[in-house]
């Protein structure tokens, strides 16, 4: 499957493409579904800004189960500030509607004005997080900031890297 996460005012749109034939890349799209405050989704207060979705292998600390965790970064807001990361266990069989609702978090990476972000998982299993940040929205310019984050930090101890 392929997951698309796109920006929209107040949150995200999620859509899932499911392959019916990998060899020919045939398949079908689900429907784009809004993720925001009304479905306990990814809330972006007073903004529509690019972010990143990343799937990582993790261990649920309470159950000990191996899981796949979806991470979604966006400015939490209001406006373009307080970039953060939402998280959610996924199985790979979710519909767009399932994927859009019931996210946990967010973990706030910064309280400062901040906007676009991207992330990858490093070989040591930490999350490399790269984002725009500035001291004031009136400056019309961002600095690029790099941080390494642990999965346990992002999830408030609920998950750890596997």
Residues of each region from the PLM?
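Beta-rich carbohydrate-recognition and catalytic domains
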Residues: 1-49, 55-112, 123-126, 131-162
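Hydrophobic core register within WD40 beta-propeller blades
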Residues: 53, 117-119
